[in-house]
C-alpha cells in the first residue's frame, strides 16, 4: 500500500496498520503513512495477529501465517503450486488466501495483474544490474583512439520480463538475441529490435494464457544445442523463462557456462 491508497481506505472506514519501515525501499518513510491516516506497528507478530485482511508482497512464512488470527484474509504472492506447505499452513490456521500470482492474464483482470508489473520491473532491473557489473560498455563507441564493439546480450524467454529486458538493452545500445519456444513471440522480439534465435518447431508445445504448459524433452535438448553457440559469444545472459506452477526450467547448463566467455 502507498500513502495515496491508504487515504482512500481510511476514507472508506478501514483502520490501516503498517509495519514500521515497510515503505523504506520504496522511499516512503513512516511519517508519510501516518500522515495518510495509518497506524505504525513495530512488532510484526502484533501486526499479523491484529489484521482482518493482511496485504503482503512476498509469500509469508509458515511461522507468520501462524501469527494470523483464524478467519483472516491473506492477499499476497503465494506460488501455491510450488509451496504446498504454505497452503497447508493457511488451512490449518483457517486463513482465506488469495494468491496474486495465480490471477489469469485476461483483460478483465489487468488491473490486478501484479505478476506482470513485477516482471516488468525485473526485466528492466536485470539489464541495469548486468550493465553495471559488466566489464565493458553496451553501445558501439567510435573514437580517434579506436572502436569499441557493442556488447551482446542473450535473453532467454520473451514474456513480460524478457520483452522489457530487450527494450532496455536495445536502448542502451547492445546487440540483443532472444530465445523463446513460442514461435508467435518472434514478431514481438523483432519489433523491439531483437534478433530471434530460431529453433525448429515442436507440435507438442502447449500454450495457455500466454504461458507454456508443456514441451517435449527432445525439443528442450534441441533448444540447448542451438543456444549454446549464442550463449558462448554473449557478454551478458538474462534468463526470464517461467512455467506457472512449476519450477523454472534450467536453460543455461554448467557446460554452457564453461565454454562461454569468462566474463559472462
PLM feature spans:
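Short, well-ordered beta-strand core segments
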Residues: 54, 74, 195-196, 237
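An N-terminal-biased, well-structured beta-alpha scaffold segment characteristic
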Residues: 1-89, 93
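Glycine/serine-rich phosphate-binding loop and adjoining beta1-alpha1 elements at the start
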Residues: 62-152
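A structured beta-alpha segment of the ubiquitous adenosine-cofactor-binding alpha/beta core
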Residues: 37-52, 59-60, 206-237, 241-256
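Glycine-rich phosphate/diphosphate-binding loop of Rossmann-like nucleotide-binding domains
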Residues: 1-28, 139-230
Amino acid at each position: 500500500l502507498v500513502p495515496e491508497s491508504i487515504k482512500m481506505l481510511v476514507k472508506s472506514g478501514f483502520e490501516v496498520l503498517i509495519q514500521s519501515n515497510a515503505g523504506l525501499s520504496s522511499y516512503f518513510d513512516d511519517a508519510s503513512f501516518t500522515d495518510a491516516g495509518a497506524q505504525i506497528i513495530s512488532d510484526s507478530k502484533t501486526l499479523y495477529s491484529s489484521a482482518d485482511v493482511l496485504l503482503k508482497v512476498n509469500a509469508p512464512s509458515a511461522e507468520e501465517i501462524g501469527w494470523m488470527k483464524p478467519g483472516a484474509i491473506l492477499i499476497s504472492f503465494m506460488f501455491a503450486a510450488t509451496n504446498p506447505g504454505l497452503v497447508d499452513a493457511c488451512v490449518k490456521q483457517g486463513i482465506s488466501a488469495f494468491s496474486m500470482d495465480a490471477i489469469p492474464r485476461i483483460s478483465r483482470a489487468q488491473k490486478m495483474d501484479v505478476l506482470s508489473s513485477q516482471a516488468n520491473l525485473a526485466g528492466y532491473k536485470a539489464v541495469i544490474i548486468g550493465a553495471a557489473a559488466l566489464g565493458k560498455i553496451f553501445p558501439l563507441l567510435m573514437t580517434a583512439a579506436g572502436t569499441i564493439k557493442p556488447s551482446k546480450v542473450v535473453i532467454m524467454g520473451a514474456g513480460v520480463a524478457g520483452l522489457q529486458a530487450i527494450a532496455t538493452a536495445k536502448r542502451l545500445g547492445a546487440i540483443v538475441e532472444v530465445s523463446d519456444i513460442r514461435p508467435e513471440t518472434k514478431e514481438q522480439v523483432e519489433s523491439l529490435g531483437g534478433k530471434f534465435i530460431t529453433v525448429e518447431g515442436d507440435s507438442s508445445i502447449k500454450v495457455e494464457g500466454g504461458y507454456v504448459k508443456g514441451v517435449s524433452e527432445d525439443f528442450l535438448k534441441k533448444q540447448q544445442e542451438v543456444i549454446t553457440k549464442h550463449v558462448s559469444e554473449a557478454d551478458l545472459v538474462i534468463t526470464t523463462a517461467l512455467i506457472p506452477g512449476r519450477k523454472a526450467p534450467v536453460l543455461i547448463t554448467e557446460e554452457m557456462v564453461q565454454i562461454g566467455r569468462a566474463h559472462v
